[in-house]
Amino acid sequence: MKEQLLTKKILNWYDLNKRSLPWRKNVSLQKRQYYTLVSEFMLQQTQVATVIPFFNRFIKNIPTLKLLAKVQNKKLLKLWEGLGYYSRAKNLKKTAQTVTKNFKGKIPNNYEDLLSLPGVGNYTASAILAIAFNKPYIPLDGNIERVLKRYLYLKKEKDIQKDNLIKKKSIFGTSSRSSDYAQALMELGALICKPTNPLCNQCPISKNCKSLQKKDFNLTKNNKKNIDKYFLLKVYKKDQRYLLIKNT
């Protein structure tokens, strides 16, 4: 019952406050699936505000998955220019080609097949299933993680490990509006439960937020040590251009 109430509050807030984003347009199911695929690739490691103009330009020039599968690399990379992480663009095209060849041009609507696509990991697969196919998945991005950590007041390092957060997110429950609900949770983290200075007075679920009750909004960082790796590189220069090659 509590989960249903939580879901209702978040969706009611979303209906009134959601941002108007180009990939949220009321379009055909096929277009929505394509828009979701493109936007999720672009949003990997890039903020929403930065992505919007690139997404609009990309869709204007490559409006369908079929065209994406056949686009010349030069044109593709030109459209991606300025967005960075060009491997995303290359993987996006490879994904379009794989979908065209192996799935009859239709983006798969199950987790295992999505994970088989180039550049699609656990998060992207969950996001596509929720947003494009209205399936009951909650993709655990940085925004939703933050809401979860604060709402449950997760402070211990073992509590904020990814595996534990995946289990804890069940507190959010499910909705028949899975597409909207996944985006609502993302919006809540992006617009209200910000990394600093969260807008608790505007939060639809603040009443039961443990961090608000304790007046402690600091987030415990995952202190899992990263391993530094070092490589020797060969540098070649020609006509003011540089080429770096890993020395194996």
What is each of the regions a protein language model found here?
Residues 2-4, 13-199, 205-208, 213-214:
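Catalytic cores of DNA base-excision repair glycosylases
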Residues 10:
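Non-catalytic nucleic-acid substrate-recognition regions in nucleic-acid-modifying enzymes
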Residues 213-248:
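N-terminal strand-loop-strand
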